[in-house]
Amino acid sequence: MAADSNCGHSDYSQAVSYLYGLQKFGIKLGLDRTRGLLNALGNPHKGMKFIHVAGTNGKGSVCAFLESILKEAGFKVGFYSSPHLVRFTERFRINGREIGRDAAASLTDEVRAVSDPDDPPTFFEATTVMALSFFAREHTDFAIMEVGMGGRLDSTNVINPIAAGITNVSMEHQQYLGSRLLDIAYEKAGVIKEGLEVIAGVTQPPVVDLYGRLSSEKGARLLRVGKDIRYRTTSSGLHYYGTDRRMEGLELSLKGSFQSRNAAISLGIIEVMGRKGFKLDEDHVRAGLKSTFWPGRLHVFSHEPALVLDGSHNPGAIRTVVSTLDKTFSYKRLILVMGIMADKDIGSMLKEIVPIADHVIYTRPVYERAADPKVLYEKARGLGAVGEVAADIPLALERAKALADSRDLILVCGSLFTVGEALTYLDPVAYCPDPVRVY
């Protein structure tokens, strides 16, 4: 997974330090600064072919499926994602390969040179512009853009995509997107644009009604998974029944029955691309689904005992993991290693998963937003599992391994930051971290 053989690089270190410094400006939703930066750079994104994916959970997996399928078909594919697990360069990929540190440093310098010191970009605005410039410079055939937050005012929404997807909607980021489910759904609907075909995995009737109305008003075509696009989960993947294609016996490399729905959304987008003149052979689709790699999502690191890492970081994602554990893994006892960000719905997350565990080790990654593990421990009182606190992730992992026998399952979860730090500890060569921590 390492982008370069060497983890250190002075120009790169300075670049990520600058980007990290932009986080002090917080989150400022809106497109004006992003458009201004792109205009100053000559609007490199104009004329590019984009795929835009929004949603509360699963959008990274949908994007990863798309990247793998298009790569198998021989296309040069860019993929912009967030957050990263261990390295900033993970956010910018072409055909699965991360951007090099020299290129990342150079792009940072270019964005910094055209930034207004009186109205500086946020971290995510700067990285979005870097991604668009990088993909344009590399002449990608397609660029897959994962929404950072919401959609309507997310900096990725400066693009004009050829296809879009919305995975699902649940409560998240209420301080920015609104306090009601429909407020959040409306923000995500910002990716629905005139003339666009949008594949949606949403299920709540009010959200379905909202998206139907907005699509009609904008002259877009909404295709729903479960209605216009159907699928059936199998032991190894899914059968897919789309608007133009039927494909049975599709195998998925990503674990969890929930991934069949994400795959169906991806295949719906592939069908949209076919109607745009980019029809892919079924062999490429099959091979792409079977070879998709997306670490940190029900990621099996080792066996006997099984050590699995999942970056689920909200109640909906935790609920999905809980519903799939027994279907995916065979184990005697479940030992959790949990680290959660302080701004998340901690109580609801714990209520979803702690009761099914046998032992829970509460910990925290080295990150200022992380909740104190003692707080997690106190909030979990009365939920059933035996609990204890470990000051950091290495201690938590060693404690979990000491407790487990070969038939147990150790699950690291609660945050992508927790998972990323765990991977760095478990395999510091493959998951070599940045010299400066940037999220």
Where are these regions (language model features)?
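Short functional linear segments
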Residues: 1-55, 62-73, 80, 116
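ATP-dependent carboxylate-amine ligase
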Residues: 2-10, 159-160, 182, 272, ...
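ATP-dependent carboxylate-amine ligase catalytic core
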Residues: 25, 31, 35-46, 72-159, ...
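Nucleotide phosphate-binding/pyrophosphate-handling subdomain across enzymes
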Residues: 46-47, 142-147, 154-165, 169-173, ...
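Aromatic/hydrophobic pocket-lining residues that form π-stacking "cages" and hydrophobic walls in ligand
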Residues: 66, 131, 211, 376, ...
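Extended acidic/charged loop-beta regions that coordinate divalent cations
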Residues: 127-176, 208-249
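Short glycine/serine- and small hydrophobic-enriched flexible loop segments
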Residues: 133-136, 268-275, 424
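Beta-strand->loop->alpha-helix junctions that form or flank phosphate-binding loops
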Residues: 201-202, 214-233, 253-257, 285-291, ...
